[in-house]
Amino acid sequence: MLALPPPYRLRPMTVADIPAVLAVDRASFPTPATEQLFVNELTDNQLAHYQVLLRDAAGGETLVGFAGFWLIAGEIHISTIAVSPAERGRGRGEWLLLNLLLLACAL
Protein backbone atom coordinates (compact mmCIF):
# COMPACT_ATOMS: atom_id res chain seq x y z
CA MET A 1 0.00 0.00 0.00
CA LEU A 2 1.15 3.51 -0.81
CA ALA A 3 2.52 5.47 2.17
CA LEU A 4 0.85 8.88 2.40
CA PRO A 5 1.75 12.00 4.35
CA PRO A 6 -0.31 12.75 7.44
CA PRO A 7 -3.20 13.42 7.85
CA TYR A 8 -4.08 11.04 4.98
CA ARG A 9 -4.30 7.27 4.87
CA LEU A 10 -5.64 4.52 2.63
CA ARG A 11 -7.44 1.34 3.60
CA PRO A 12 -9.79 -1.22 2.05
CA MET A 13 -13.37 -0.03 1.59
CA THR A 14 -16.00 -1.61 3.85
CA VAL A 15 -19.79 -1.69 3.69
CA ALA A 16 -19.82 0.88 6.51
CA ASP A 17 -18.07 3.33 4.15
CA ILE A 18 -20.85 3.23 1.54
CA PRO A 19 -22.82 6.32 2.71
CA ALA A 20 -19.69 8.50 2.54
CA VAL A 21 -18.63 6.86 -0.74
CA LEU A 22 -22.04 7.66 -2.24
CA ALA A 23 -21.68 11.32 -1.21
CA VAL A 24 -18.34 11.59 -3.04
CA ASP A 25 -19.75 9.62 -5.98
CA ARG A 26 -22.75 11.97 -6.31
CA ALA A 27 -20.42 14.98 -6.28
CA SER A 28 -18.20 13.39 -8.93
CA PHE A 29 -20.36 11.77 -11.60
CA PRO A 30 -23.48 12.83 -13.52
CA THR A 31 -24.95 9.34 -13.08
CA PRO A 32 -24.00 8.24 -9.58
CA ALA A 33 -23.70 4.64 -8.49
CA THR A 34 -26.25 3.02 -6.22
CA GLU A 35 -25.80 1.72 -2.72
CA GLN A 36 -26.60 -1.78 -3.94
CA LEU A 37 -23.83 -1.62 -6.55
CA PHE A 38 -21.22 -1.00 -3.86
CA VAL A 39 -22.73 -3.61 -1.54
CA ASN A 40 -22.51 -6.17 -4.35
CA GLU A 41 -18.96 -5.16 -5.23
CA LEU A 42 -17.80 -5.53 -1.62
CA THR A 43 -19.71 -8.67 -0.67
CA ASP A 44 -20.28 -10.71 -3.84
CA ASN A 45 -17.66 -9.80 -6.44
CA GLN A 46 -14.51 -11.84 -5.83
CA LEU A 47 -12.74 -9.87 -8.59
CA ALA A 48 -13.33 -6.45 -7.01
CA HIS A 49 -10.83 -4.52 -4.90
CA TYR A 50 -11.79 -1.10 -3.48
CA GLN A 51 -9.88 1.40 -1.35
CA VAL A 52 -10.85 4.59 0.44
CA LEU A 53 -8.78 7.70 1.07
CA LEU A 54 -9.29 9.16 4.53
CA ARG A 55 -8.21 12.47 6.06
CA ASP A 56 -7.79 12.77 9.82
CA ALA A 57 -9.34 15.87 11.31
CA ALA A 58 -10.50 17.09 14.67
CA GLY A 59 -13.52 14.99 15.50
CA GLY A 60 -12.56 11.98 13.40
CA GLU A 61 -11.79 10.86 9.88
CA THR A 62 -13.39 12.09 6.69
CA LEU A 63 -13.62 9.96 3.56
CA VAL A 64 -12.28 12.17 0.77
CA GLY A 65 -11.92 9.68 -2.08
CA PHE A 66 -12.21 6.12 -3.26
CA ALA A 67 -11.08 3.90 -6.10
CA GLY A 68 -11.59 0.35 -7.26
CA PHE A 69 -10.56 -2.23 -9.79
CA TRP A 70 -11.38 -5.73 -10.91
CA LEU A 71 -8.58 -8.26 -11.36
CA ILE A 72 -9.49 -10.44 -14.34
CA ALA A 73 -7.11 -13.01 -15.86
CA GLY A 74 -4.04 -11.21 -14.55
CA GLU A 75 -5.15 -7.78 -15.77
CA ILE A 76 -6.83 -4.94 -13.93
CA HIS A 77 -9.88 -3.00 -15.04
CA ILE A 78 -10.13 0.26 -13.10
CA SER A 79 -13.81 0.61 -12.34
CA THR A 80 -13.83 3.97 -10.56
CA ILE A 81 -11.78 6.77 -9.04
CA ALA A 82 -13.40 9.73 -7.30
CA VAL A 83 -12.20 12.53 -5.04
CA SER A 84 -14.35 14.97 -3.10
CA PRO A 85 -14.51 18.44 -4.69
CA ALA A 86 -12.67 20.08 -1.77
CA GLU A 87 -9.68 17.75 -2.25
CA ARG A 88 -9.37 17.95 -6.06
CA GLY A 89 -6.36 19.41 -7.80
CA ARG A 90 -3.97 18.30 -5.04
CA GLY A 91 -2.83 14.90 -6.31
CA ARG A 92 -5.36 12.84 -4.33
CA GLY A 93 -6.60 11.04 -7.45
CA GLU A 94 -3.00 10.26 -8.34
CA TRP A 95 -2.50 8.71 -4.90
CA LEU A 96 -5.56 6.54 -5.43
CA LEU A 97 -4.44 5.43 -8.90
CA LEU A 98 -0.88 4.64 -7.79
CA ASN A 99 -2.21 2.69 -4.83
CA LEU A 100 -4.46 0.61 -7.11
CA LEU A 101 -1.48 -0.24 -9.30
CA LEU A 102 0.62 -1.24 -6.28
CA LEU A 103 -2.19 -3.40 -4.92
CA ALA A 104 -2.71 -5.08 -8.27
CA CYS A 105 1.00 -5.87 -8.60
CA ALA A 106 0.96 -7.45 -5.15
CA LEU A 107 -1.93 -9.83 -5.97
Where are these regions (language model features)?
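Acetyl-CoA-dependent GNAT
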Residues: L2-Y8, P12-R88, E94-L107
